[in-house]
Amino acid sequence: MSQNKAFSTPFILAVLCIYFSYFLHGISVITLAQNMSSLAEKFSTDNAGIAYLISGIGLGRLISILFFGVISDKFGRRAVILMAVIMYLLFFFGIPACPNLTLAYGLAVCVGIANSALDTGGYPALMECFPKASGSAVILVKAMVSFGQMFYPMLVSYMLLNNIWYGYGLIIPGILFVLITLMLLKSKFPSQLVDASVTNELPQMNSKPLVWLEGVSSVLFGVAAFSTFYVIVVWMPKYAMAFAGMSEAEALKTISYYSMGSLVCVFIFAALLKKMVRPIWANVFNSALATITAAIIYLYPSPLVCNAGAFVIGFSAAGGILQLGVSVMSEFFPKSKAKVTSIYMMMGGLANFVIPLITGYLSNIGLQYIIVLDFTFALLALITAIIVFIRYYRVFIIPENDVRFGERKFCTRLNTIKHRG
């Protein structure tokens, strides 16, 4: 596949389908949390009960992610993306009509399965469409997720203030997924192979990657990065109400600030990652910023700190470092992008399953301990990002025509080693 073909009209339709699906995925991730009060009343439960319900999303990801990685590599990207859309349709149309918590949990599992299918189809497809700019391509996924997460809290707040039935907030995304289905059926996807001429312009391996070191560190980074922003998405409104004295409508808007922050980061780094900054540098910087911010949110809770903190966490932890982690791990292990993505995201699914259970328990003890947990995850992300950063420049030789910010000394050292060898 040539780089020019990636921009032809048939592939652009496929790219639009993927990005639009991630916009709606962003909504699906926070739907249960944003409607926590309405759903708790509907199912006669409390916040911990809805946290249990949310854990079904993680279970769905956990049980399906490896399966879809194999399917994506064998049968193609479009097939698994279509499977994802079907699962999303079941969730959005099913929750409003769901009679009990048990069935709702099954629908939450469907969202997790849908996310697995979308990730193992969408990420590899985007990297295959834009092999020279895979970092920018995958980080824009986060932009679309953030658009969805910025829009949806505003919709929920509007419906809450105007006494509109919460179910309309699920039916509308369901209708949009029907439109995506029609678009997917007409779209074409690129080949799973990349031209050798393109590959030669990318960083070349100087030594064999170590699965037990950079492989494990990359996966742990993904878990920590996911958990850092996931905790904020679910629990920041409740924390802001309890410790900053904010009303429910005001507290829900913290997630809009969070999404705005992630969008700002996405567009800044989408530009920087093309030629100026390599993803591993972005991951170290952003995880350090998230660690500092989580500490401030815990130590100095106030409306200003909660709103600003949500924005900065959105910028740092949710601004695409999870997606960049996938891109970096695919560089270390490039032979099977979907399988790499599935392993990486499987651990995120494990976190998606376990973290709601832990935070649900902590919510009964004290919401402040949830923020302490968030700080711990941010710190783990920083430590593992530094490990991957160090290993990257030991494994790869940076081409002279692709030296980026801060890399000159690394590039010179590694090229010297190569010539001596």
UniProtKB/Swiss-Prot annotation:
It comes from the Bacteria. One of its GO terms (molecular function) is transmembrane transporter activity. It holds the Pfam family MFS_1. One of its GO terms (cellular component) is plasma membrane. It is a multi-pass membrane protein. InterPro entries: MFS, MFS_dom, MFS_trans_sf, MFS_Transporter. Keywords: Cell inner membrane, Cell membrane, Membrane, Transmembrane, Transmembrane helix, Transport. Residues 31-49, 100, 158-163, 237-251, 301-308, 364-369 are periplasmic. Residues 1-9, 71-78, 122-136, 185-215, 273-279, 330-342, 391-421 are cytoplasmic. It is found in: Cell inner membrane. The chain crosses the membrane at residues 10-30, 50-70, 79-99, 101-121, 137-157, 164-184, 216-236, 252-272, 280-300, 309-329, 343-363, 370-390. Gene3D superfamilies: MFS general substrate transporter like domains (1.20.1250.20). Belongs to the major facilitator superfamily. This is Inner membrane transport protein YdiN. It comes from Escherichia coli (strain K12). The lineage of its organism: Bacteria, Pseudomonadati, Pseudomonadota, Gammaproteobacteria, Enterobacterales. The gene is ydiN.
